[in-house]
A protein has these predicted regions:
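Conserved structural core of kinase catalytic domains
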Residues: 1-26, 75
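Catalytic-loop of the protein kinase fold
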Residues: 34, 38-55
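Activation of the activation-loop gatekeeper triad in protein kinase-fold domains
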Residues: 64-69
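Conserved activation segment of eukaryotic-like protein kinases, specifically the C-terminal portion
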Residues: 76-91
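Conserved end of the kinase activation segment
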Residues: 90-100
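Conserved hydrophobic scaffold of the eukaryotic protein kinase-like catalytic domain
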Residues: 109-113
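Helical subdomain adjoining the active site within ATP-dependent kinase catalytic cores
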Residues: 115-227
Length: 227
């Protein structure tokens, strides 16, 4: 394997806790990577901080392909179940590798990045530098969404939808019932735009003479892109 000039994701996060914009950019890069994997029907199978590297330009590199799934690999046993704290309880019962193997891990990782961007103090509070997870522990996952970290996330209006999405995923009996990350984020963005549009209409908002409908649409799209 070629040498890659990149940092492990957790190291990158630790180095950028004082730069929330860098962590938000990391979250967007991760979201885009997962979208591309989904489009190709690919799953890594052991998605966690140690298997994701961040290049100096912010692009991501996946390593350790022992549990990889691509289209046409149906029927191959799912022997590597992934790191605890990243895996859905149903993963242990999955017999074969599948395109759905990463759905829960992706949601956990994205939520962790977004949460640390908003609340960097959690890094020291939970001594995350010394853990084998990024934010959620195995006990957090086993709690079904009732642990302290879930309460903290749901107290933040910008990211509470992610905590609720994890809780909803934990209620699902199998990985194929979990909503893909890009659909969760898009659903939230669409909701934000819809609510803003309703507020503007209810307040009889009138754009200035120099604003076109395209300008307004672009403003809404920019707001949505931040989610």
């Amino acid at each position: 394997m070629d040498w890659v000039d990149a940092k492990p994701m957790k190291k990158y996060i630790a180095d950028n806790l004082s730069r929330p914009s860098a962590l938000e950019s990391l979250a967007r890069a991760f979201l885009e990577m997962t979208r591309e994997l989904h489009e190709q029907g690919i799953s890594h199978g052991d998605l966690q901080h140690g298997n994701i590297l961040v290049r100096p330009d912010g692009s991501l590199v996946l390593v350790d392909y022992d549990s990889l799934y691509v289209l046409g690999m149906d029927g191959i046993p799912d022997d590597i179940k992934g790191l605890q704290g990243y895996q859905h309880p149903a993963r242990i019962h999955q017999r074969y590798r599948s395109a759905y193997s990463d759905f829960f891990s992706e949601l956990v990782i994205y939520t962790s990045i977004r949460t640390l961007a908003k609340h960097p103090g959690l890094w020291n509070k939970y001594s995350l530098a010394d853990t084998e997870t990024m934010l959620f522990t195995e006990k957090d996952i086993q709690s079904g969404g009732t642990s302290e970290i879930f309460r903290l996330i749901e107290s933040d209006r910008d990211i509470r939808y992610l905590g609720r999405a994890i809780k909803d995923a934990l209620r699902q009996p199998s990985l194929d019932r979990i909503v893909p990350l890009q659909d969760i984020v898009k659903g939230q963005a669409d909701s934000v735009v819809e609510n803003l549009s309703k507020q503007w209409l209810s307040q009889s908002y009138q754009p200035s003479a120099f604003q076109s409908n395209i300008d307004i649409f672009n403003q809404l799209a920019e707001i949505a892109s931040r989610w």
